[in-house]
From Swiss-Prot:
Name used for this protein in its record: Glutathione/L-cysteine transport system ATP-binding/permease protein CydC
One GO term of the biological process aspect: cytochrome biosynthetic process
Pfam families the UniProt entry points to: ABC_membrane, ABC_tran
E.C. number(s) listed in UniProt: 7.4.2.-
Keyword presence, Cell inner membrane: yes
Described function: Part of the ABC transporter complex CydDC that exports the reduced low-molecular-weight thiols cysteine and glutathione to the periplasm. Export of these thiol-containing redox-active molecules may be crucial for redox homeostasis in the periplasm, permitting correct assembly of various respiratory complexes and formation of correct disulfide bonds in periplasmic and secreted proteins. CydC contains transmembrane domains (TMD), which form a pore in the inner membrane, and an ATP-binding domain (NBD), which is responsible for energy generation.
Family: Belongs to the ABC transporter superfamily. Cysteine exporter (TC 3.A.1.129.1) family.
Taxonomic source organism: Escherichia coli (strain K12)
Top-rank taxon: Bacteria
TM helices/strands, residue ranges: 16-36, 37-57, 137-157, 162-182, 250-270, 277-297
Domain notes from UniProt: In CydC the ATP-binding domain (NBD) and the transmembrane domain (TMD) are fused.
Amino acid sequence: MRALLPYLALYKRHKWMLSLGIVLAIVTLLASIGLLTLSGWFLSASAVAGVAGLYSFNYMLPAAGVRGAAITRTAGRYFERLVSHDATFRVLQHLRIYTFSKLLPLSPAGLARYRQGELLNRVVADVDTLDHLYLRVISPLVGAFVVIMVVTIGLSFLDFTLAFTLGGIMLLTLFLMPPLFYRAGKSTGQNLTHLRGQYRQQLTAWLQGQAELTIFGASDRYRTQLENTEIQWLEAQRRQSELTALSQAIMLLIGALAVILMLWMASGGVGGNAQPGALIALFVFCALAAFEALAPVTGAFQHLGQVIASAVRISDLTDQKPEVTFPDTQTRVADRVSLTLRDVQFTYPEQSQQALKGISLQVNAGEHIAILGRTGCGKSTLLQQLTRAWDPQQGEILLNDSPIASLNEAALRQTISVVPQRVHLFSATLRDNLLLASPGSSDEALSEILRRVGLEKLLEDAGLNSWLGEGGRQLSGGELRRLAIARALLHDAPLVLLDEPTEGLDATTESQILELLAEMMREKTVLMVTHRLRGLSRFQQIIVMDNGQIIEQGTHAELLARQGRYYQFKQGL
């Protein structure tokens, strides 16, 4: 239960709407009970009056009460659903924002151990499951308790013994049934949450890996694993449905026994009258209607195990401490940036081998640096240190002679423009995919930058309104690289980090892109990670890395004259 406390605290923000929903639920329940109780008494009293030949029976007042209760029940149910669901959606919106805001600082270190499907399931499905806490647990429980009190007190004016007998049965049922079915459904609910996450994780992996699975003939094997998980998931759902049916059956049985007990006790007299008359129907129908108000409570607590399991899974993410933190102080963004690295050392979590070993580097403002080396030598890790995806365990990084850790996050993001190794294409329009780098850019500026990076073909159909990603046009690897370069050019930051910007491009396009970068980034500080040797002669410095260390550094001509590793790379062309 403790896992729910942080999320119950979030409900305070919408306490008035949530409270109004509970009040409307109580009014609806009381109107429903009043309708059946008054109708039963009215019909019975009318029959008794007819048999007795009474002509003074007031038909108008009870009839008006029946109509009033019916209208109140209908209107109350409508507005209760409207208010409760609106409040629930607001709480879910707040919860999603809260969860996502907690996730952002964790990337990439805190999220590296989770698969994409698992993260998606926790952020979407587990958050959605928490709406059961209000709709299926809190509201029915509070409503049932208030209804029991009102019914007991109301009936006590007619007969104290009958009222408190019925109230005691309902109160005992309310205290015993929910904990009983919570325990019965706890393991099933936890299993459902686990299997749902496992299924979505496997489904995501199966869909994303279709090409490789088909090529290597492993698609059927993975499909079988997916089907087995689905069967287990359906079996858990079946067990939960059986528990729901059992709880409803027990509630019907208790309700029926309570009705029989009321009928037997009321037959001996009501309120001191040996002849109960139509009042016997009033107590019987009140008992029948009151137990309908208790019906949702047992089923609700059966789902509580699933709600708690989802809360634990979300808290497992949100309670993590970020590896990298930013100060809250305001920092001015510089127009030009120099860069200094002093004895930077870094090791990835749960790995023994150092990714960076004593990196020391001085980059002057406006200088262009190329970083060369084989795969896994630490080039991309070095760029990640500059974006503060990770912080070094030893050494320091300075921007304009100030520690990079002294910049707040907004200032750092404005200072650095990045072309990442893995470019993400959002399922959105071409315009939206570019505006994330420069929200204030005009359509003319976006179209011009696309033409300059060789993506003018994307403008042929629907122009900037062309839909990209899922449900739209897919981009090739080379097109994705050029889109990332377009974003970097639009961002217009003084420090530019390029991670394999020409990977996947043909020689002609590569030369055009390198010329474009040299032209548009002439006054900027540039660090480019690459495997390719084309165009490196235009860089002021070339750094060769191996095994997390800088092994060579100098100009193109100097490195060729030394006939070291860079020379060997050139000779291997």
